[in-house]
Amino acid sequence: MNKIVIVTGASRGIGREIAKELAKKEYTVIANYNKSEKQALELKEELEKENIKIDIFKADVSKRNEAQELVEYTINKYGKIDVLINNAGISQIKEFTQITDEDWNNMINTNLNSVFYMTQETCKNMIHNKKGCIINISSIWGVVGASCEVHYSVSKAGIDAITKSLAKEMGPSNIRVNSIAPGIINTEMNKNLSEEEINNIKEEIPLEKIGKAKDIEKCIEWLIEDEYTTGQIISINGGWGI
């Protein structure tokens, strides 16, 4: 494929599946991680056993200087960035009146500021090259809101706002910007849900099942290769919320 792809938050969950599958399809993948070094190294070793290359890079992309380092590393080594996938994120269940300043700031920094920093730094290279693809991973909660997850919902809604606004601004530079807003996906982030809660959610989903990380990855592939889709919030949720 010969496209250079940065995936943030790529050591676990949806990000790991995205990075792994794109690497298998011969995209040049820079898999970013922050705290989960063990999982990132395991991903690299797993793929190397199949003679598949993947690059890993440690950076806390909620900090401007470390986001810059990741972007500069990629450009210096590979010459360009074709695709940026902003996936890094955290979640927290907490009643609104119990959310502390630290909780709020940590959520906004990790989920929203990281998108701002990574996208702003990457866009400079994409504008110069007159092409690019930016895919943000938001959430259905950013669209409909979630009880006891106000700060999470706000951070994800902000990502969708960036997506729509930036798509208009970057369109003339042939840079496409889209969001994928997953519903409930079977990843570590949702491990806090009980079996009863999962079953209750399934009853609300027309397809009566929880999504898989691979469902998101397939959409990522399509958005990378597409040439005319921009400014869209694509919710992969099994029909939840219809």
Regions found by a protein language model. Name each.
Residues E95-F96, D103-I108, N190, E197, ...:
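Substrate-binding pocket helix/loop in short-chain dehydrogenase/reductase
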Residues S139:
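Residue(s) in the substrate-gating loop at a strand-loop-helix junction
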Residues K25-E42:
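Conserved glycine-rich Rossmann-like NAD(P)H-binding loop of the short-chain dehydrogenase/reductase
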